[in-house]
């Protein structure tokens, strides 16, 4: 992604005089900053779809290494102490058989030598698929969707991993619940991101 990016979420910007995308200008978020490898357009969107829905689990190894190569400096600068994948609901996990965000987080963890903590964040509410919803609908759909393990000892700086950042609703909700649990700073990385304005 070579274009000018939003300094908060990393969406590419059309207007080079701006520092923030329209979404980040309008709202205060629960996370500090985030970045993505690519814009969510073909062929990237096709590859992410195959990773997610067509059992192309080995893509996660390649993409996880790519995340480490591209963002190693950023991750070190953020002072990340643990990597947490965005969880799937139990029913979706049973149906799919794997969590693509967890596979990405595992590979990134191995490359960076930072622990992945997968049993921290839980999806306790079965949500409707987000792909056909606007930002407000996504936010309502995700309200109360996540919980944090009561036995977890919160870290100061956490990195959330997901496959796609569209409106940011998933990252927002997950970051909010982690902060309520005592995390000070939440950052995110995703494979791809929607287009900014």
Where on the chain are the PLM-derived regions?
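Glycine-rich phosphate/pyrophosphate-handling loop used in enzymes and phosphotransfer proteins
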Residues: 1-197
């Amino acid at each position: 992604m070579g274009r000018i990016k939003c300094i908060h979420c990393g969406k590419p910007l059309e207007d080079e005089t701006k520092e923030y995308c329209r979404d980040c200008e309008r709202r205060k978020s629960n996370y500090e900053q985030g970045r993505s490898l690519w814009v969510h357009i073909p062929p990237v969107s096709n590859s992410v779809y195959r990773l997610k829905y067509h059992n192309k689990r080995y893509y996660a190894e390649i993409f996880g290494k790519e995340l480490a190569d591209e963002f190693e400096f950023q991750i070190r600068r953020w002072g990340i102490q643990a990597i947490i994948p965005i969880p799937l609901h139990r029913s979706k996990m049973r149906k799919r058989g794997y969590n693509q965000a967890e596979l990405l987080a595992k590979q990134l963890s191995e490359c960076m030598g930072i622990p992945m903590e997968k049993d921290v964040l839980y999806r306790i509410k079965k949500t409707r698929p987000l792909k056909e919803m606007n930002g407000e609908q996504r936010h309502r759909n995700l309200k109360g969707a996540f919980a944090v393990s009561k036995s977890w000892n919160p870290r100061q700086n956490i990195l959330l991993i997901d496959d796609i950042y569209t409106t940011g609703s998933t990252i927002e909700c997950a970051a909010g619940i982690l902060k309520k649990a005592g995390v000070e700073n939440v950052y995110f990385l995703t494979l791809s991101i929607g287009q900014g304005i």
